[in-house]
From Swiss-Prot:
Protein's UniProt keywords contain RNA-binding: no
Example GO biological process: transcriptional attenuation
Entry keyword annotation includes Transmembrane: no
Summary of the function given for this chain in its UniProt record: The rhoL-rho operon is regulated via attenuation by Rho-dependent terminators within the sequence coding for the RhoL leader peptide. It has not been determined if translation of rhoL is required for this Rho-dependent termination to function.
Protein name, UniProt field: rho operon leader peptide
Alphabetical UniProt keywords: Leader peptide
UniProt-annotated stretches for the region Disordered: 1-33
UniProt feature, compositional bias: Polar residues: 1-25
Length: 33
């Protein structure tokens, strides 16, 4: 789980955007898997 958050932060330079897309990113990664 920690790796996921780090990856998202690294991919998204905008911390605020990442926070708002936190639930969307998690679902996207789950679907991709």
């Amino acid at each position: 789980m920690r790796s996921e958050q780090i990856s998202g932060s690294s991919l998204n330079p905008s911390c605020r955007f990442s926070s708002a897309y936190s639930p969307v990113t998690r679902q996207r990664k789950d679907m991709s898997r």
